[in-house]
Swiss-Prot record:
EC numbers: 2.1.1.177
Chief location: cytoplasm
Highest taxon, organism lineage: Bacteria
The family this protein is said to belong to: Belongs to the RNA methyltransferase RlmH family.
The keyword rRNA processing belongs to this UniProt entry's keyword annotation: yes
Protein name: Ribosomal RNA large subunit methyltransferase H
Classification via InterPro entries: Alpha/beta_knot_MTases, RlmH-like, tRNA_m1G_MTases_N
Lineage, broadest ranks: Bacteria, Pseudomonadati, Pseudomonadota, Betaproteobacteria, Rhodocyclales
Localization annotation: Cytoplasm
Amino acid sequence: MKLLIVAVGTRMPAWVEAGFGEFARRMPRELPLQLVEVKAEPRTTGKTVEAMMAAEATRIEAALPARCRRVILDEHGADLTTMALARRLEAWQAGGEDVTLIVGGPDGLSPALKATAHERLRLSSLTLPHALVRPLLAEALYRAWSVLKNHPYHRE
């Protein structure tokens, strides 16, 4: 099984790449964490938000593996604790299917793409900068794995 993050937006600041890379490197070989960036639709006048999200959804769909469990990051998704995420990760591993976590652009994800999700999660009830999602999600997944393996990274 592998974990894939498909995120809208390219050219993130160096700290985003460094943060994501640090936790992706820590993941074990049997559970690799990869990132695929898709181009955000340019925010220009004359385009509706719906049209921009639809264009981004097309790019996201093209980046998704043929068979995977789709997990949408959404402000209305399930709010999980670290222990609950660890249990979810364990269930995903037991299912054996690759898991793709989908991060939308500045306006979110299109309703049509959201409808294809197997699950919806949210990282926080706080409003966070868009760029922070990648390293935060990578750290949360690494922490969940460390809980399952009784690794000393996570402490109760």
